[in-house]
């Protein structure tokens, strides 16, 4: 299943990450790292980067570590955990990504505050989703899923204190919502 997710999420991930303007040397976190594809993609976009991955699923952590075994504990660090309590210090990351995962985060507003906490001033949070209706059939099929529209996600980011929030769309179904942590002057 995780290899299938890596494959099916690749077009969305490749498109969405192009919108971020990833810089060399960044420290990045992929929340809900699944099978590890996004971690690999982030490393290709940023020379001398460090990429952290976190997933609540032990199976996902094992797969992501296997996919990234050649650089594990050098440039890549993967741990099991939740978006509700990220095991990282304040202001650690230049970029946090979430590809097709916010639907499963309990207490999304609280999780967004937690992401905000671990981002550096000026840091970016990119949420990549396939657009679904909030009353979608998926929420009836997939346990623990809450569907959000891009507009709902943008509002939640704004409420959490992100700035410059923007929705980018690629028809028919892809959306990337990016928010920035204000810089401290």
Predicted regions and their residues:
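Conserved alpha-helix/loop element of class I SAM-dependent methyltransferases that forms part
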Residues: 7-26, 41
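Conserved class I S-adenosyl-L-methionine
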Residues: 25-34
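Conserved SAM-binding loop of SAM-dependent methyltransferases across substrates and taxa
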Residues: 35-46
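A short glycine-rich, Lys/Arg-flanked "PGG" loop and its adjoining helix->strand segment in the class I
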Residues: 109-121
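Core SAM-dependent methyltransferase catalytic element
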Residues: 169-185
């Amino acid at each position: 299943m995780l290899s299938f997710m890596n494959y099916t999420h690749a077009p969305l991930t490749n498109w969405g990450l192009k919108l971020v303007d990833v810089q060399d040397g960044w420290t990045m976190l992929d929340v809900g790292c699944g099978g590890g594809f996004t971690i690999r993609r982030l490393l290709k976009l940023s020379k001398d980067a460090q990429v952290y991955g976190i997933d609540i699923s032990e199976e996902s952590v094992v797969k992501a570590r296997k996919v990234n075994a050649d650089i594990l504990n050098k440039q890549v660090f993967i741990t099991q955990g939740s978006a509700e309590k990220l095991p990282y210090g304040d202001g650690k990351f230049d970029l946090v990504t979430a590809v097709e995962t916010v639907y499963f985060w309990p207490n999304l507003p609280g999780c967004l505050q937690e992401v905000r906490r671990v981002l550096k001033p000026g840091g970016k949070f990119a949420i990549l989703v396939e657009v679904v209706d909030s009353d979608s059939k998926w929420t009836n099929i997939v346990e623990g899923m809450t569907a959000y529209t891009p507009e709902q996600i943008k509002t939640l980011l704004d409420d959490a204190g992100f700035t410059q929030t923007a929705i980018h769309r690629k028809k028919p179904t892809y959306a990337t919502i990016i928010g920035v942590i204000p810089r401290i002057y």
